[in-house]
Amino acid sequence: MITDTIYQQFGHLLNRSERLRTTVLVLANTAGCLLMLSPALSLIAATSSAIYIYNHNQGPLDWFMFECMLGVTAFSAYLTWQLLNIRPEQPEGIRLKPEQSPEIFEMLERRANHFRIKPVTHINLSTGTELKIVGTPVWAVPIYHRHTLCTGTPLLFFLGRGQFRLGLAGAVAVAANKRICLSGWLDQAANDWPLIISALKSNDSLLPRLLLKPIDWLATHIEHLSIRLRADWRQQQSRWVLDNSDEQNTTDYLASHLVATAFLDKQYWPMIFKAADRSPTPVVKAFSHLPLLLHKTLNKKHAERWLLEAQTFGKQQQTGVRDLLAELRIDHLAWPGLPAESAFDALFSNKEILKQLDTYWQNTIETQWRVAHTRYKNHEFRFNQLKKSAQEQGLRGESALKFVKLAPQFVDRQGAIAIYKEMYNNNADDAKVCFACGLALLRSSSVDAGITALQHAATLDPALAKRARVLVSEHRNAWVDEEPEHQTTTMEHATA
């Protein structure tokens, strides 16, 4: 009991004192480094001891100690060799060659020289929307790093050439600052430990079995203690952009970055993965078709809604956006639209690199795609069973709930609405089914029927009344999406 109280008080003190938190982080990261380097340190100590004893041998006992030191040296050398063969995973993506886009390499070299840092020679084109220099440990110790410029290919279609140059300069500036300050090393180490743990887990040798548990324990506490530190460093690039550019350029860059991320997560990838319903292997050319699909499916209304969500909703990754805008005294973000000439078109003379990225993405996503296809086929089989049962004898309880849940995947909106109403009428005495049908009707834009079903569910079970009121209120205040059938049809035509 006393120990728990002391632990809680120390935790509160850590939350209040940044200096204490930094001190604990330094100690924890140093302990982790020493633990990972323990085989090499033991090798040095045992070898030195063996040499000393050999040179000062005075009897049988010294010979025994010498032989013991030789054994410790051999064992330490074995563990050190295993340590050298544990390599954390490098950033995802395909390696860009200088001849594919010489201008990007020239930009990066000029910026590295300007900030007086070691040249970054590796550039990866990834499938995300990042634009940053990523340091990854060469070995399983967060000390020596290989630095790579990671550029999200989709982001290049949302930025103009000038915006890309501005973002690249900010990325190099952050990398330069991170190398010369203590908080930068702590942030880098906090990002390194998950990679090191993943490398230890994927290696079945003796050293990972000895070190995994203590390193995992340390990494868990380091991650918790460095939450604020990492959040602050995530915003350093945007702060640099504002300090070295005008407010309009900064807001345009931030808005384009947020819209690109939201477009991929909320619209593009769900639309692409619909093809898993038809094909067991990923045959869609997600990046070769991206420019066409981007102009066909993205509109101003969606972009403004995503920006509003980023500035108002409480997700952890979006909280930093609100804090940054408040710190920079920016009232709101407005999307400037897609550039007349994207950074990709300006920096790449041909689109051959997109075909390489298609192949890389298809190989990377193959397992996940196969799982999605299998899940769809299982759902399709279950839906057909429930549909047959509904026609023959009707559905009740859990079967009705499952039928309502699966309906949007296999019938159009009008067909789904008919199913929701049928299940509601057949289960008018079941609060859970009525609530599920009401929610599904609201999402299908059948507002009056949805509200009626939710109110009836609240009558059957008063515990659902508050949730029903919240859902109705949220729906009345929500932005209206385009019908998903339009997006699916667009993708099918474009990828045919």
Where are these regions (language model features)?
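Hydrophobic alpha-helical transmembrane segments
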Residues: 44-72, 205
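Peri-catalytic and regulatory segments of divalent metal-dependent proteins
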Residues: 83-192
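Cytosolic-facing loops and C-terminal tails of multi-pass membrane proteins
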Residues: 1-16, 206-230, 243, 247-448, ...
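Transmembrane alpha-helices and immediately adjacent membrane-cytoplasm interface residues
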Residues: 61-90, 109
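Transmembrane-cytosolic junction motif
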Residues: 78-96, 224-233
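An active-site-proximal "capping" alpha-helix that borders the catalytic cofactor pocket
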Residues: 109-113, 169-177, 194, 229-250, ...
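Post-HEXXH active-site segment of zinc metalloproteases
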Residues: 177-212, 252-258
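Canonical alpha-helical transmembrane segments of integral membrane proteins
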Residues: 27-51
